[in-house]
Amino acid sequence: MDAAGVAAKPSLSRKPSPSFRLRNGSLNALRLRRVFDLFDRNGDGEITLDEMASALDALGLGADRAGLEATVGGYIPAGAAGLRFGDFEALHRALGDALFGPVEEEEPGKQGEDDDEGDMKEAFRVFDEDGDGFISAAELQAVLKKLGLPEARNLATVQEMICNVDRDCDGRVDFGEFKCMMQGITVWGA
């Protein structure tokens, strides 16, 4: 309430949600590619409206079919059965702009290492579920399971994934190891 006793209206932030758009283009493209691949159930390179509806239902975000068609239909090219990855990126960008405003373009070189570091830390925290500063095989397995990835079924496979980036051989991934791994990822088509 303000001084006159009137309840203040909540203000909506126009900044992008850090969970919706990452500042680091490579991380954002990688995340979008993973989401695209999960939504594309049959692996044909297109997300149909049925696949989109199923994915949203699985996430607990059931969408009205007519509303989904109205929102997504304009991004499906003529003659295509569904969204290709580029179309999916355009839809994601348009939704982000509509919900949070357009991304402010920065001068080349101005986007500092602070932004990249912040994105890396945010991504690390997704995996470090207990907040102890390390990603254990159990934590990685839990995240892979939430993403519906088949690697989550076998703990030995998950432990091998950990070993591939665990430079100090302590059986878990610290932030430095995570950062090196993420910086070594090449995103094709990004």
UniProtKB/Swiss-Prot annotation:
Report the domain of life of the source organism: Eukaryota
Q: Where does Ca(2+) 3 bind?
A: 166, 168, 170, 172, 177
Q: Which SMART domains match?
A: EFh
Q: Where does Ca(2+) 1 bind?
A: 40, 42, 44, 46, 51
Tell me the ranges covered by the EF-hand domain, including all copies: 27-62, 115-150, 153-188
Q: Tell me the keywords, alphabetical order.
A: Calcium, Metal-binding, Repeat
InterPro entries named in the record: EF-hand-dom_pair, EF_Hand_1_Ca_BS, EF_hand_dom, EF_hand_pair_protein_CML-like
Task: Identify the residues that bind Ca(2+) 2.
Answer: 128, 130, 132, 139
Any Pfam family from its record, for instance, is EF-hand_7
CDD domains assigned: EFh
Q: Which GO terms describe its molecular function?
A: calcium ion binding
Q: Please describe what this protein does.
A: Potential calcium sensor.
UniProt-recorded name of the protein: Probable calcium-binding protein CML27
Q: Which species?
A: Oryza sativa subsp. japonica
